[in-house]
């Protein structure tokens, strides 16, 4: 794309505020182009399931330069040895399912992932777009009993159950989150009494 100094200006101003010497150095080269983002904000690495011996390294979500060395090493090892050198499921291309063939769902979820890219990443944070997508017949019953759901591969499943008087929603933080006490009680019941999974 053409250089876009107007778009870049706010970032340059913030950089100069932190490193004043940048004001006199100027911009020598601008690279302005498209970037690829994925529905879960993670890379896509590994062997394409539909095409033997085709290895993929894509969807770096604006971290391609920073992650290129490690991703290149992992792919090289995978190609040479026939298996990944470590557990890469979070970025493995095989993590995608038939759900990811739904263009509207992918678009909505990828826009949400892009929107979260430069925000605070809280532990256990769930995506909200495209939900609920797939739910068991017990979904409504469990929700009525205070279930707070998360989503895995499109399937809604209860993460925890809100107690009486507690709002049935996640409140994210870097410390103990609002589900900590409720999950502790569920754990204690499982350990000392009977629970059904």
Name these PLM-found stretches.
Residues 86, 93-197:
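Glycine/proline-enriched, intrinsically flexible loops and inter-domain linkers
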């Amino acid at each position: 794309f053409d250089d876009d100094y107007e778009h870049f200006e706010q970032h340059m101003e913030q950089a100069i505020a932190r490193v004043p010497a940048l004001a006199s150095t100027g911009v020598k080269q601008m690279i302005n182009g498209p970037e690829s983002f994925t529905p879960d904000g993670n890379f896509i690495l590994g062997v394409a399931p539909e095409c033997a011996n085709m290895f993929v390294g894509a969807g770096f979500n604006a971290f391609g330069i920073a992650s290129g060395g490690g991703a290149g090493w992992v792919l090289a090892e995978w190609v040479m040895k026939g298996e990944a050198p470590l557990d890469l499921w979070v970025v493995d291309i095989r993590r995608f399912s038939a759900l990811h063939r739904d263009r509207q769902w992918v678009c909505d979820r990828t826009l949400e992932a892009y929107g979260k890219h430069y925000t605070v990443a809280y532990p256990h944070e769930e995506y909200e777009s495209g939900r609920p997508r797939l739910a068991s017949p017990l979904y409504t019953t469990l929700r009525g009993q205070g279930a707070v759901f998360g989503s895995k591969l499109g399937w809604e499943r209860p993460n925890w159950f809100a107690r009486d008087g507690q709002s049935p929603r996640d409140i994210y933080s870097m410390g103990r989150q609002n589900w900590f006490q409720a999950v502790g009680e569920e754990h204690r019941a499982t350990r000392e009494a009977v629970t059904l999974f």
